[in-house]
Design a protein with these regions (language model features):
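Non-catalytic structural scaffold of enzyme domains
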Residues: 1-121
């Protein structure tokens, strides 16, 4: 575990949050988690759809993304539960404690196929 005993901030689309995928998995492990409040979720949806997916310059969504993180002070680390969010973090050159589920799935699939995985960047 990379963040034992820490509270996860789940960042994802409304649909993913409504499905409860990450919440259920964390609950099964007895882990604590939080999600954005309504205003922060609105801002996150704008970052995802009007920013990253729309191909906008990172500077155009920087303040919105940072406002989401700032509104989640109880989160010790973030689960980047939408494929656009790791791209945003990288483009904005943010150094935040985070888990990229897509990267974790890829690493697991590679190991499952019998290949060693490379160290984390």
């Amino acid at each position: 575990a990379r963040f034992p005993g820490k509270r996860a901030g789940i960042l994802a689309t409304r649909g993913t949050l409504s499905a409860g995928i990450y919440q259920q998995a964390l609950d099964a492990q007895g882990a604590h988690w939080t999600v954005p409040d309504s205003e922060a979720q609105d801002a996150l949806m704008e970052v995802i759809y009007d920013g990253v997916k729309a191909g906008q310059a990172p500077a155009s969504y920087r303040s919105r993304f940072l406002s989401v993180l700032e509104r989640m002070p109880q989160a010790d680390y973030f689960i980047l539960g939408c494929t656009e969010l790791p791209l945003a973090v990288q483009a904005l050159e943010l150094d935040i404690p985070a888990v990229d589920p897509t990267e974790e799935i890829a690493r697991t699939a590679i190991r499952f196929c019998g290949y060693p995985t490379l160290p984390r960047p």
